[in-house]
């Protein structure tokens, strides 16, 4: 069963958070909804805590997501910053409705910028996972630009397919 979820728009630090929340006692899979359904992920069993960090969760109905028992961390990033980052990858912009949905999800709300300030991130991390905060590991990961190249490539290919269907 999924123990925790990280919800955010694309380019909002979900890959970085998946790395942070993968520890000796937990695993956080980034963008698993490209390959599996939520029901399939919930049926997975393993040792330790299991979490997902997936931008596609923002497409789900907020009420449905709120009914799921997993703890949720919701990451907010300015829509202009999200869209600027998406444009650099050749991907379409997100709409206002996607950002508003985040407000409807229950859980721990944090901004993208707060992820990179230890005094703001630490309470969120400790809330999501009941384990001691590793400040040395945080300092190391904080400086890394972590991106999921496979998810980016899949999104680009899906967008190209969509554009080609529009031309037919």
Report each predicted region and the residues it spans.
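The conserved 3'-phosphoadenosine-5'-phosphosulfate
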Residues: 35-38, 102-168
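PAPS-dependent sulfotransferase catalytic domain
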Residues: 55-134
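Short coil/turn segments at beta-strand junctions that form active-site/ligand-binding loops
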Residues: 2, 47-48, 68-71, 106, ...
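A sequence-composition feature that detects small, non-aromatic residues
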Residues: 15-18, 39, 43, 47, ...
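PAPS-dependent sulfotransferase catalytic core
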Residues: 1-50, 135, 139-144, 149-150
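Low-complexity, intrinsically disordered/propeptide-like segments
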Residues: 23-24, 94, 166
């Amino acid at each position: 069963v999924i123990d925790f979820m990280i919800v955010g728009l694309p380019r909002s630090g979900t890959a970085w958070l998946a790395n942070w929340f993968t520890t000796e006692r937990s695993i956080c899979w980034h963008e698993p909804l490209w390959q599996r359904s939520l029901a399939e992920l919930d049926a997975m069993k393993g040792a330790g805590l299991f979490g997902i960090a997936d931008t596609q969760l923002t497409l789900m109905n907020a009420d449905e997501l709120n009914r799921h028992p997993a703890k949720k961390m919701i990451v907010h990033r300015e829509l202009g910053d999200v869209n600027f980052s998406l444009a650099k990858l050749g991907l379409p912009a997100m709409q206002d409705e996607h950002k508003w949905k985040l407000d409807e999800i229950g859980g721990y709300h944090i901004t993208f910028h707060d992820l990179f300030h230890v005094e703001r991130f630490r309470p969120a991390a400790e809330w999501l996972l009941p384990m001691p905060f590793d400040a040395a590991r945080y300092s190391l990961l904080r400086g890394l630009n972590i991106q999921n190249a496979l998810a980016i490539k899949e999104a680009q290919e899906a967008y190209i397919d969509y554009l080609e269907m529009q031309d037919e």
